[in-house]
Curated annotation (Swiss-Prot):
Name of protein: Cephalosporin biosynthesis expandase/hydroxylase
Pathways involved: Antibiotic biosynthesis; cephalosporin C biosynthesis
Entries under Pfam families matching the protein: 2OG-FeII_Oxy, DIOX_N
Domain Fe2OG dioxygenase residues, every copy: 155-268
Keywords: Antibiotic biosynthesis, Iron, Metal-binding, Multifunctional enzyme, Oxidoreductase, Vitamin C
Main function: DAOCS catalyzes the step from penicillin N to deacetoxy-cephalosporin C, which is used as a substrate by DACS to form deacetylcephalosporin C.
Any GO BP: small molecule biosynthetic process
SUPFAM superfamilies: Clavaminate synthase-like
Family: Belongs to the iron/ascorbate-dependent oxidoreductase family.
Cited Gene3D superfamilies: B-lactam Antibiotic, Isopenicillin N Synthase, Chain (2.60.120.330)
Residues annotated as binding Fe cation: 184, 186, 244
């Protein structure tokens, strides 16, 4: 583990025992490891194995049934290389070399009842931990939240995604394309990330800390916490939203480089509003031509091209699904 990233126990965050240390971490780095979160390895393992089994063994018909044609939706299944963080952030044209499943509060698409039972329980447990972390982060910097109570603020519109990063092919090794997923900050208040380690020891996840990207290895019993752009906006610029990325392995580490990450974005309510010019001054790419905008509008403009274009035949095979509730807008 890099010495630049602190580690906190959830109980210590909730009790205020490490209030000063937490405030320093979120205002200067925007990242820390979280231990004793209330979730145990079995919680993560069950959700991960259920999802990866579907990725590997689900039929094409089953996958089409939980794939939305709506380019803006973040629900259900996204096939390998269907998304591109690099295109959205204007840092490249390469795809995210991963397969993904997403769910939220409502409008979900589950492959079967067993999958739904496992994932609904996992979602609820991650949501509880994320709210506890967000309360601690916001309290540590004395966030005013424009008069809104913190408990009300964290009852919001979260998103849970599991990404499976398979071993990369020869044309996606680091010598050909350095990244599996482009550098980005999260559109969330905070984000919880539970990652599995690559079997060959390669560390794929990195975060920008003190001006350089540092490795974020898997720690037993720990999750990574990223502070997101909404955390910055909600605290008047106090909380830092760091950029992070996923590296590609070199040719000598290609075999054994598969990994997963369960990512829980604590996103605000869709009508969360903020000052556009101020957000730009804090480094966020908000191009909406108005003085103020909402989280819903920001997502709609910023992530419309998250899903990469596919051949017409492939797109035609994806049926249009029922519209997702407006309480569940586009994903990070």
């Amino acid at each position: 583990m890099t010495s630049k990233v602190p580690v906190f126990r959830l109980d210590d965050l909730k009790s205020g025992k490490v209030l000063t240390e937490l405030a320093e971490a979120v205002t200067t780095k925007g990242i820390f490891y979280l231990t004793e979160s209330g979730l145990v390895d079995d919680d993560h393992t069950s959700a991960r194995e259920t999802c990866v089994d579907f990725f590997k063994n689900g039929s094409e018909e089953e996958k089409r049934a939980v794939t939305l044609a709506d380019r803006n939706a973040r629900r259900g299944f996204s096939a390998l290389e269907w998304e591109s963080t690099a295109v959205v952030t204007e840092t490249g044209k390469y795809s995210d070399y991963s397969t993904c499943y997403s769910m939220g509060i409502g409008g979900n698409l589950f492959p079967n009842r067993g999958f739904e039972d496992v994932w609904q329980d996992y979602f609820d447990r991650m949501y509880g931990a994320a709210k506890d972390v967000a309360r601690a982060v916001l309290n540590s910097v004395g966030a005013p939240l424009a008069g809104e109570d913190i408990d009300d603020f964290v009852e919001c519109d979260p998103l849970l995604r599991l990404r499976y990063f398979p071993e990369v092919p020869e044309d996606r090794v680091a010598e050909e394309e350095p990244l599996r997923m482009g550098p980005h900050y999260d559109l969330s208040t905070i984000t919880l990330v539970h990652q599995t380690a690559c079997a060959n020891g390669f560390v794929s996840l990195q975060c920008e800390v003190d001006g350089e990207f540092v490795d974020l290895p898997t720690l037993p019993g720990a999750m990574v916490v990223f502070c997101g752009a909404v955390g910055t906006l909600a605290t008047g610029g106090k909380v830092k939203a760091p950029k992070h990325r996923v590296k590609s392995p070199g040719r000598d580490q290609r075999v054994g480089s598969s990994r997963t990450s369960s990512v829980f974005f604590l996103r605000p309510k869709p009508d969360f509003s903020f000052n556009v010019q101020q957000s730009r001054e804090w480094g966020f790419n908000v191009r909406i031509p108005s003085e103020r905008t909402t989280f819903r509008e920001w997502l709609g403009g910023n992530y419309v091209n998250m899903r990469r274009d596919k051949p017409a035949a492939a797109e035609a095979a994806v049926p249009a699904a029922a519209p997702v509730s407006t309480a569940a807008p586009i994903a990070t």
